[in-house]
């Protein structure tokens, strides 16, 4: 049997040709003289059909019956080489199918644990290494891949340089209570929460930089939106205003959505994602509303029949129900800007004339997906940043390199970060972030 293989995703290019596919058996059915195989190879799913008379005619009765019997008894996830003629078939949901003419078993599969029946979440997570083979899980990972590809493409086209920040650090970029600590040859070190502080150094050297890699948050949160290890893209840029930063973030998110539509259309179809709705998010401008305007809206509607969130005063932080209501109210991704300085990071620059608010923005995704981007302008004045750190009782010695950036040619600069898994969850339309990463790390899960 020829081993010049064709990927399932490329099968439509070979209508009327005999091809060979390397695949796994996702499922099988049939009776009597016919057998149906659901095949997958990592690029797509496809159906093959085997007819007993055709095998007898080609190989003779003894060998033909033996091969057909092999097909009928293939177990789930057996790996095979399968050869056949690609034929158009309107009855098939693919529009075509493979008329199987030969088969070779590569690797047998016995007692595969994830059968077509329903399984509980814990069971599926315990078998995550196998669950990834399922139709929907494969589709989610294809969307993840499309979003990562679109990330690199977007920043390359916009003049950014990939800049790698360290995973191990002696300081915290965000909340120091959420750090994973480790021993670094007798000195305390921490797994990175964000590459932002180092990216600011990169922006002072290279103008526009971004990084993409794993970050770690020791949050004891057990929600559908939290992971303890996830992949983050951080971007930093010099000589860009707050409004220009929001424009860039909006263009980036739209590029990610378009990238998924262009590169993973079959995956979106498998997940039954409303592509017209995704296209709406691309076509319409994102809404921008200030924190105080958002609080006013929440207070005005808190007694509405369909609302389900707690009362907030100006100065309170949003919870997930508030974020959901805000984004659903506007119906498109929504920037909430200028939050109170009291619960935002020390490095954020105050709003001119209003030191109680900072030049920052969170992008809230509609359909209940909540925050997907957080960003701000950074305090570029040395004395102001030192005063803020002293006000918060921070140890300046841990941030000397960061303060140096304000001493030697400081400029207006800002940046933002996006958790890729949250973006994947939003674009894919899935319910839980654990499915947006191959092997999720959560509060009570560190394996497989």
Swiss-Prot record:
GO terms for biological process: asparaginyl-tRNA aminoacylation. The keyword Cell membrane does not apply. Its main location: cytoplasm. It catalyses: tRNA(Asn) + L-asparagine + ATP = L-asparaginyl-tRNA(Asn) + AMP + diphosphate + H(+). Gene3D superfamilies: Bira Bifunctional Protein, Domain 2, Nucleic acid-binding proteins. GO terms for molecular function: asparagine-tRNA ligase activity; ATP binding; catalytic activity, acting on a protein; nucleic acid binding; transferase activity. GO terms for cellular component: cytoplasm. Its EC number is 6.1.1.22. HAMAP family: Asn_tRNA_synth (MF_00534). Homodimer. This is Asparagine--tRNA ligase. It comes from Streptococcus thermophilus (strain ATCC BAA-250 / LMG 18311). The gene is asnS.
């Amino acid at each position: 049997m020829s081993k010049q293989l064709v990927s399932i995703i490329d099968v439509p290019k070979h209508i009327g040709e005999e091809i060979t596919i390397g695949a796994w058996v996702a499922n099988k059915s049939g009776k009597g003289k016919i057998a149906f195989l659901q095949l997958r190879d990592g690029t797509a799913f496809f159906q093959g059909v085997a007819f007993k008379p055709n095998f007898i005619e080609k190989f003779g009765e003894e060998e033909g019956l033996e091969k057909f019997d092999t097909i009928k008894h293939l177990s789930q996830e057996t790996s095979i080489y399968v050869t056949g003629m690609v034929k158009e078939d309107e009855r098939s949901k693919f529009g075509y199918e493979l008329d199987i003419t030969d088969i070779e078993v590569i690797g047998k599969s016995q007692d595969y644990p994830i059968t077509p029946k329903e399984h509980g979440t814990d069971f599926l997570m315990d078998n995550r290494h196998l669950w990834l083979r399922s139709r929907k899980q494969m589709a989610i990972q294809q969307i993840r891949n499309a979003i990562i590809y679109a990330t690199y493409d977007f920043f390359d086209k916009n003049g950014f340089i990939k800049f790698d920040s360290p995973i191990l650090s002696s300081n915290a970029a965000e909340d120091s209570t959420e750090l994973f600590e480790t021993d670094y040859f007798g000195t305390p070190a921490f797994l990175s929460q964000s590459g932002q502080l180092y990216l600011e150094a990169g922006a002072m050297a290279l103008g526009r930089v971004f990084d993409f890699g794993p970050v770690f948050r020791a949050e004891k949160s057990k929600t559908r939106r939290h992971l303890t290890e996830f992949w983050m893209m951080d971007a930093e840029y010099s000589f860009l205003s707050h409004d220009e930063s929001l424009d860039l973030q909006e263009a980036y998110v739209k590029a990610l959505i378009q990238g998924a539509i262009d590169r993973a259309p079959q995956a979106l179809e498998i997940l039954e994602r409303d592509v017209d709705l995704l296209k709406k998010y691309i076509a319409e401008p994102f809404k921008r509303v200030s924190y105080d305007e958002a609080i006013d809206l929440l207070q005005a509607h808190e007694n509405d029949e369909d609302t389900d969130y707690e009362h907030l005063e100006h100065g309170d932080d949003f919870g997930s129900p508030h974020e959901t209501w805000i984004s659903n109210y506007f119906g498109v991704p929504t920037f909430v800007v200028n939050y109170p300085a009291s619960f935002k990071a020390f490095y954020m620059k105050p709003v001119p004339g209003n030191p109680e608010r900072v030049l920052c923005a969170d992008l809230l995704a509609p359909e209940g997906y909540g925050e997907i981007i957080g960003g701000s302008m950074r305090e570029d004045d040395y004395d102001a940043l030192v005063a803020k750190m002293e006000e918060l009782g921070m140890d300046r010695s841990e941030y000397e390199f960061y303060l140096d950036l304000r001493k030697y040619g400081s400029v207006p600069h800002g940046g933002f970060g996006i958790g890729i898994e949250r973006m994947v969850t939003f674009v894919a339309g899935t319910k839980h972030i654990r499915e947006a990463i191959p092997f999720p790390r959560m509060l009570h899960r560190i394996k497989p």
